Amino acid sequence: MNSVEVAEPTEVPEPIPIIETSDDDNNTNTNTAPTPVLASNGFTNGHSHTNGHHAHGHATPSYIDSMAHLSVIRDDSDAASVRSNSSRASRRPQMQLSNYQDEFTTSVYGSRFAGMDLPRHHMPECEMPRDIAYRMIKDDLSLDNNPMLNLASFVTTYMEDEAEKLMAESFSKNFIDYEEYPQSADIQNRCVNMIGDLFHAPVGTAVGTSTVGSSEAIMLAVLAMKKRWKKRQAAAGKSTENPNIVMSSAVQVCWEKATRYFEIDEKLVYCTMDRYVIDPDEAVDLCDENTIGICTILGTTYTGEYEDVKAINDLLVERNIDVPIHVDAASGGFVAPFVVPDLEWDFRCEKVVSINVSGHKYGLVYPGVGWALWRDPEYLPQELVFNINYLGADQSSFTLNFSKGASQVIGQYYQLIRLGKHGYRAIMSNLTRTADYLTETLEKKGFVIMSERSGAGLPLVAFRFRTPQEGGDEDRHYDEFALAHHLRSRGWVVPAYTMAPNSNVKMLRVVVREDFTKTRCDSLISDVTLCLGLLDETDRESIKKREEYIKKHITTSGKGKHAHPSYANETHSLQGKTGKTHAIC
């Protein structure tokens, strides 16, 4: 049996000096700090005292020194007395140093900052403790909607912890600095190769680059098409004025930006009541010698339909028209190859010269990362590519920006090798099944389904109320926007849109993302049923008043007015001209 050794009482160590700052000057003096002492009973004592004397000079009772676990109770006047009796240093010029002292508190909400507004227009003069800054901003952001309940956006809202850790470790890396971060640059090249292979890009000739999203990728592709067209026209001695591009009126707003910024005329193929995508014959008929290209969409923003790239390609070949195709695969580029692999929309079509895809949508990476790929350097004019010697390394660059973080590219690489084709196929198959389940349920509730099913389009559900002509309720006194507002009160962000021009349709859209499980889908269905019941029980006048109130108090409705007043009522875009909603994607 082991014996227990009893520790001898620990001797009192030398007192620790404390430097105290006087309130009225910068002089310092030395006092002694009470030192913890381990008593023979194993407990730590209170404060020890020096020379057996009180700070006021009075004799300390002798039993105090002999009882190490007791302490004399003092007040602030004792310390003040010590300071007043200390010798003063000689007067000297004062340095202009900050007198600001940190404010310590036992709680963030007990600090003075909790009773102040967060700065909005001017940088504050003084610092704020980091824990308070974090909590104040976190509390402010808590008023945002829950991203997982935001069914308006295609943007990824879930990544694994390991992916997040890798990305966080790369926050400080400037991707453009190839010399210092060669592996990060090589990882981009690996991603370009893998995505190019997924899109059946010609081996050995295809080129590509990462971007901050599909908008930048589209801008680059449009620039390349315009420059190539301009060179061809100049070589033939023809005018290089008034270039145009053919596209559907359902395009995302970045296409309108590209045509406006780069001075290109739009030739629109308008949607109809029963067709929400481009018409191949009409698109090809609109082409002329000034057409720089045709935009086709692999998954439209509104209904998720895949436009018929193969049909347009075949018509161009059949009529011997030298017009290239760009495929906007922002949403569908990581879906179609796994759900409908036999669908020909990519570089298998000879007229397809460039493709963009968003890594931060169904590529399953947090925003923002996108990819732009070209069939051959022939379709990416050399005069658009800059060879830059930056920080010691020669590099070819074709981007609209320069510095950017490497973390999103690394996140994309993680997903590509972590999931592989099998993993992506499993995820996209689940999303397609969930979208079909939601489609069937909403259809049974009397909605008209506008989106495709069984993988023929993106995993989303676009739906609307039936009109009286379609057998809908003639007495229904609310629309899709009213239902969207009621769903928001339940936490769901289900957007209501005005469809593309000439279709004259209102609609709702649910984007089925990776984290939208069947259980969450059932919760949404229950809340749709609840909101429909509430709307049925609410009279027309009350609904109208509520809509007017929401419009008046737009900040609290989640639709704050962020447009600058000078630009609030623009009339140059499709939204300004026709009322089409520039939908979130």
Task: Describe the role of every protein-language-model region.
Residues 183, 210-217, 247, 251, ...:
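Secondary-structure capping and boundary motifs in well-ordered enzyme cores
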Residues 291, 295-296, 317, 335, ...:
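Hydrophobic alpha-helix feature that most strongly marks membrane-spanning transmembrane helices
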Residues 152-155, 175-179, 204-212, 357-360, ...:
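A short glycine/serine-rich beta->alpha loop
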Residues 171-179, 203-209, 240-242, 266-271, ...:
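Glycine- and acidic
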Residues 326, 338-459, 463-471, 476:
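Active-site C-terminal subdomain of aminotransferase-like
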Residues 91, 96, 100-105, 212-386, ...:
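Conserved PLP-enzyme active-site core in the AAT-like
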Residues 188-195, 251-255, 279-287, 401-408, ...:
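Structured alpha-helical segments in the cores of large, soluble enzyme domains
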Residues 2-6, 16-23, 33-42, 52-185, ...:
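Non-catalytic terminal extensions of PLP-dependent enzymes
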